[in-house]
Each structure stands twice: as C-alpha cells, then as structure tokens.
Regions:
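Transmembrane beta-barrel strands of outer-membrane/channel proteins
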Residues: 35-43, 55-57, 73-81, 91, ...
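Short loop/turn motifs that connect adjacent beta-strands in outer-membrane beta-barrel proteins
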Residues: 19-35, 63-73, 119-125, 162-170
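Outer-membrane beta-barrel "beta-signal"
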Residues: 75, 147-170
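Residues that define the transmembrane beta-barrel architecture of outer-membrane proteins
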Residues: 4-12, 33, 51-55, 105-111, ...
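Transmembrane beta-strands of outer-membrane beta-barrel pores
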Residues: 18, 41-47, 61, 77-83, ...
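Residues on the lipid-exposed face of transmembrane beta-strands in outer-membrane beta-barrel proteins
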Residues: 12-16, 57-61, 75, 113-119, ...
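Outer-membrane beta-barrel translocator domains and adjoining extracellular loop/strand segments
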Residues: 1, 26, 49-53, 85-92, ...
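A conserved active-site cap/scaffold subdomain adjacent to cofactor or substrate pockets
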Residues: 1-25
Length: 170
C-alpha cells in the first residue's frame, strides 16, 4: 500500500463595491465607474508548506473613464508569512552559497499600485509598481546575495491567442 500525502489550508476572498458614480441607478451599464474594496487571506495548516500565511487588501477604481469601460487603477497591500523552518532553510542555503547566513524575516510586505488597460482584440496591458519590505530568496534559495527593500516595476501583457486566431469566442 502506498502512502498518501495530504495538506490542508483555507482561503477566503471577498469584494465589496463602496461607491458607484451612478449611485446604482444605471442597471443597464455593465461597467459603471466604481470603487471596490477587495481582500483575501490564506492559511496553511500543514507546517511543511513554505508559505504559512498570505493576506492582501486593496482598492480598485473601475471604469474611471466611461469611454474606456474596461480600464482600472488599483492599490494593494500584501502580507506574507513564511514557515519558520523554511526561513531557517533559506538562511542555511544562503550560508552554504557564500552568503552571511543571517536569518530572514518570516514576514514580507508588498505595497503596490497597478492598472489594467484594455486594448483592441481583448489584449490587455497591466503595469505594476511595488515597494518590497523584508524580501527573501524564496525563488532562488541558493544564492549568496541578500534581497534588499526597494521598488520593483513591471507589466503583464495578456494576449488571448484563441480569440485572436478565431478558435474561441471573443
């Protein structure tokens, strides 16, 4: 008989519209100018999971210009807590890679501003600027370099190939 590995976690998310420019009177408008609050949290009950806890909250301004109803602007705060054993592993991996081996903070914070710009054909450009506090080497554990607090900028370009090639409805 083989072993069966099971992990358990809980994830909760929610969104609440705080304000609509039309006061909710324009029911036929599928994209009203609105401000929404969103949040989510997750907890891993299994102590072997590297990310033990993650929680975020943000505000989203949707359809700020009715001429571009699919655009949005947002701000978000994210808090992530690593498992204590995993932070020790990261420090040990840093040491054997020639780094200081100093302990990493279990808590990481990200402060973010973001946007979503809808382009023709269902394509979307999503720029983001983040400020990172207490970064760790989660994605590159065997490095001698230590991450520093600071800014990050980037973007995602979403291209719906199926739609553009006519394989999926637009």
């Amino acid at each position: 008989m083989g072993q069966k590995a099971v992990t358990s976690q809980i994830v909760l998310t929610g969104t609440q519209t705080l304000w609509r420019a039309d006061g909710g009177r324009e029911a036929a408008n599928p994209h009203p100018t609105a401000i929404s609050f969103y949040t989510g949290t997750g907890y891993a009950f299994d102590p072997t999971i590297p990310i033990r806890f993650n929680s975020f909250a943000g505000l989203l301004l949707q359809a700020p210009d009715q001429g571009r109803p699919l655009d949005s602007y947002g701000i978000k705060i994210n808090w992530q807590r690593l498992n204590d054993n995993y932070t020790r592993f990261l420090a040990d991996a840093n040491l054997i890679s020639g780094g200081s081996g100093a302990p990493f903070s279990r808590d990481k914070f990200v402060f973010e501003v973001n946007a979503h710009f809808a382009l023709p054909g269902g394509v979307a450009l999503e720029p983001v600027v983040q400020y990172l506090v207490n970064g760790n080497s989660f994605y590159n554990p065997y490095t001698a370099r230590r991450p520093k607090d600071g800014f990050y900028g980037g973007f995602t370009l979403s291209v719906p190939l199926g739609t553009l090639l006519g394989l999926a409805p637009g």
